[in-house]
């Protein structure tokens, strides 16, 4: 699916992650900022890309500012950002959940 608009979900509070999703041209490009990037960066990127793949989003620029979010929070914020970016806020895609 193609991203229709730039969307944001989450905060920069402790134990959260802020995901900004915008149009991309060459696959899914994740720009991650995190204090725990060295230990958990690969897992954070995996959760984001796996979630976007479930939405069939193949081209996107993702800006992720992590403040110690758990995988379930990362997935929830990515789902919200993707739904907003695709203009599907009112159409819940249960298969993604």
From Swiss-Prot:
InterPro entries referenced in this protein's UniProt entry, alphabetically: CitD (IPR006495), Mal_deCO2ase/Cit_lyase_ACP (IPR023439)
Pfam families, alphabetized: ACP
Keyword Phosphoprotein: yes
Keywords: Cytoplasm, Phosphoprotein
Sites of O-(phosphoribosyl dephospho-coenzyme A)serine modification: 14
Protein's cellular compartments: Cytoplasm
GO cellular component assignments: cytoplasm
Protein family according to the UniProt entry: Belongs to the CitD family.
Protein task: Covalent carrier of the coenzyme of citrate lyase.
NCBIfam families: citD (TIGR01608), PRK13253.1 (NF009726)
HAMAP family registered for this protein in UniProt: CitD
Oligomer and partners: Oligomer with a subunit composition of (alpha,beta,gamma)6.
Full protein name: Citrate lyase acyl carrier protein
Gene: citD
């Amino acid at each position: 699916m193609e991203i229709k608009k730039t969307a944001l979900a989450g905060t920069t509070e402790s134990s959260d992650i802020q995901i900004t999703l915008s149009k991309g041209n060459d696959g899914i490009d994740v720009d991650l900022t995190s204090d725990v990037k060295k230990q958990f960066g690969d897992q954070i990127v995996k959760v984001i890309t796996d979630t976007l793949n479930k939405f069939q989003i193949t081209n996107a620029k993702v800006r992720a500012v992590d403040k110690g979010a758990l995988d379930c929070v990362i997935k929830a914020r990515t789902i919200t950002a993707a739904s907003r970016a695709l203009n599907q806020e009112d159409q819940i895609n249960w298969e993604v959940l």
